[in-house]
Amino acid sequence: MGVGGIDQAAAMQKAITEISQLVPVPLAIDTSDTKALEAGLKAYPGRALINSVSAEPERLAEFLPLAKKYGAAILCLPLSDKGVPKTASRRIEVMKTIIAHAKKAGLKDHDFLLDALVMTVAADEDACKETLHTLQLYRKHFGYPSTMGLSNISYGLPNRPLINSTFFAMSLASGLDAPIMNPYDQ
């Protein structure tokens, strides 16, 4: 939820209430608005996933207590106030920070889903290699399930479905557990 000019919290509460009655699967709540997040978590009758918690101090301070209060899982995004880490090793360091803060806030091992943070190869030719290495290091250092927005790899490029399916196979081999992807790509 990120529409300007409306009451974000009220809109989130209404959306979560309506959607949760229509689908039998857990919902991921994606907003940067703390009040909207709490409204969504409060309205949701199940265990939600907060998408996402980064290492930015404000995000840690505001979102982690809400995750604990409402029993939500968190999608951990290796992003800090310094921006997007270019290397897998730096992403591990950022992820360690997020997990340490989350555990200090009372979250448990079963509360974490780690995002590998896919960047497009159109802007950085090392993006694919670093993402795959990140997945491998997540498995080695943490053992928590991993996810990522698969199609980000091909943003701005032609023949995206082919690039995405190739990257998908490589990602699975590197330890990806739960891709965020277009199920209609062939």
Where are these regions (language model features)?
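Glycine-rich beta-to-alpha transition loops that act as phosphate-gripper elements at the mouths
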Residues: 28-36, 53-57, 148-155, 161-162
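Active-site-proximal beta-alpha core segment in soluble small-molecule metabolic enzymes
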Residues: 46-76
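Gly-rich Lys/Arg/Thr-decorated short loops/hinges at beta-loop-alpha junctions or inter-strand turns
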Residues: 1, 15, 19-20, 45, ...
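Catalytic beta/alpha-barrel core
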Residues: 1-4, 24-33, 48-58, 126
